[in-house]
Amino acid sequence: MQALGRHLLLELFDCDAEALNSLETVKASMVEAAKRAQATIVDVVFHEFNPFGISGVVVIAESHLAIHTWPEYRYAAVDVFSCGDVLQPQTAANYLIEQFGASRASVVELQRGIFLQAAPMPHKPAGAKLSGAKLSVAKLSGAKVSGAKVPVGG
C-alpha cells in the first residue's frame, strides 16, 4: 500500500495558559515549527477569540499546520499534515510540545491517501515515491504520550 501523506494529530494537555492565549506566541510558534520541519510556508492566518482562545493555520506547500487553543483548559489541538518525504512532522510536533509547555501529549500518526496499488503521482517529481502506509503512536519530547494503534490492512 502507498500513502500520499502523514498526518500527526496532537492533543497537548497542561500547557502554559498564557502562551495558549497569546496570538503572537501561538502564531510565532506555529511558523517556527513549520520552518524547523523544513516546510515551505505559503500563507499564515490566525484568529484571536474573545475572551480567550486562538485558531490558526500555517499553509505550507507540503500541506498545513493547524491549531485550536483552549487556554481555560490549558489544552491545544494541533494538526501537522505533510505530503511527500522531505518534511519532518515529528520535529514540528516536538517543538510545539516544548513551546507550549505540555506536560502530557497524545500524538497519533495517520497515513492519508492510502492506495492499494501504485497510483500515478502527477503532483510529484518524476521518480518520487509515496510513503509506506502505516499508523503509529509516536513518543515525542519529554511529555507523557498516549494513543491507540489502529491496524491497517496489508
Feature map (PLM): residue ranges:
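Polybasic/polar functional segments that serve as interface/processing modules
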Residues: 1-154
